[in-house]
Amino acid sequence: MKIAVRLDDITPDMDWERFLKFKALLDKYQVKPLIGVVPDNRDDNLKGSRQGAPDDFWAYVRELQSQGWSVAMHGYRHIYSTDKGGIFPLNNFSEFAGVSYEEQLRMLTGGKRMLAEKGIETDIFMAPAHSYDNNTIKALIESGFNKITDGFGDAPYIWKGITFYPISFRLSDTLKKKSGYSTMVVHAGTIREKEWQGYESYFQRQDATWINYSEYMSLKPYKRGIGGRITEYLLAKAKSVLVNHLR
């Protein structure tokens, strides 16, 4: 299977020590990921060590983009304001799901404008907590987005005018598959010391091909029907229940 990488929670005040350590892994194995940049971070939980932080965060992001890294808008302020899981219910909290269309449109256009003012253009959305609803889809299209990094499956698909780039349901199973495409989701700021070796072992596996996210986005998507969407919803709900049960 060919696997791309996405890094969530990219902010000026994130844990730079961990981020740069993971970046070193990506550089070593020549993988250019998708990074989810929060336009106006207000979530204190995303803050961490400033060791190694660049003087100009936005210039740094632009430089990564010029080197072939892909950039998504990761929500607006990364503040969870509802207890809704939306149409991809991996979690029961959200910045977007359950919020009115008008407010979602305001957040999306505002966030996109903030990024543009910093010289960062993007048309791909990364929902905080993976949670979004039908109003999000409608507002994304209205505000100039046409891609979402989320969903389950083995290839990009189109639904309601948006192209979805699926993430891994369970990485251990994804790594064993012989064909298809998926995404490994990484929150570098929360990686524990004992987990670093595991991440390197993933990149060293002979049965997985690691690709740049730009290659993933170059694939022609297929059209997914209602049956596929229902299956995806049920899988996300089942995974949410299982994860909560194990906590």
Give residue ranges: language-model regions.
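Active-site beta->alpha N-cap acidic-glycine motif
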Residues: 1-67, 114
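Hydrophobic faces of well-ordered beta-strands that scaffold small-molecule active sites
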Residues: 3-7, 33-35, 71-74, 122-125, ...
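Acidic-and-aromatic substrate-binding clefts and catalytic sites of carbohydrate-active enzymes
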Residues: 10-18, 40-56, 83, 101, ...
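Generic structural signal for well-ordered alpha-helices
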Residues: 19-23, 58-62, 105-112, 137, ...
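C-terminal domain-boundary segment and adjacent tail
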Residues: 33-37, 190-247
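Short, flexible, mixed-charge acidic loops at enzyme active sites
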Residues: 79-91
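Catalytic domains of cell-wall/extracellular-matrix polysaccharide-remodeling enzymes
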Residues: 95-166, 196-197
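A conserved mid-domain beta-alpha-beta active-site/ligand-binding segment of alpha/beta enzyme cores
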Residues: 159-202, 213-218
